[in-house]
UniProtKB/Swiss-Prot annotation:
Protein's recorded name: Large ribosomal subunit protein bL17
Organism: Caulobacter vibrioides (strain NA1000 / CB15N) (Caulobacter crescentus)
Keywords (A to Z) from UniProt: Ribonucleoprotein, Ribosomal protein
Similarity comment text for this entry: Belongs to the bacterial ribosomal protein bL17 family.
Matches recorded under PROSITE patterns: RIBOSOMAL_L17
GO BP field: translation
GO terms of molecular function: structural constituent of ribosome
Subunit structure: Part of the 50S ribosomal subunit. Contacts protein L32.
PANTHER family, alphabetized: LARGE RIBOSOMAL SUBUNIT PROTEIN BL17M, RIBOSOMAL PROTEIN L17
GO CC list: cytosolic large ribosomal subunit
UniProt-listed SUPFAM superfamilies: Prokaryotic ribosomal protein L17
Pfam family, one: Ribosomal_L17
Amino acid sequence: MRHGKAHRKLGRTSAHRTAMFANMSASLIKHEQIVTTLPKAKELRPIVEKLVTLAKRGDLHARRQAISSVRDVEQVGKLFAVLGPRYKERQGGYIRVLKAGFRYGDNAPMAVIEFVDRDVSEKGKDSGPVYVNDAED
């Protein structure tokens, strides 16, 4: 019987899951939209919704709780400075999960997870190192 089993294991150890969701939360806060598999997106939604609720509270204890969950102080800063005030009047439902077809290699169901009233200009901003070709001089 499957009583009391609230979450998916996703084929990972508990430490791996915790780290993965911390990284995915930071990426979602940073870019306000990410593409992942559907089960991961469904598991990520309540985690980020609770973080936004902490940001709406806005006190020091809430900030420390968010830092312990996300482990990225810069993204927690954005969470409390931008996303908390943006959703101040909304009573939950900050995240949307959209089905996005199937992945080519293994036919895994994919999904787009995004904030409801997201800032479109944040997508892809500072998403990693960029190659600069110096040989063209």
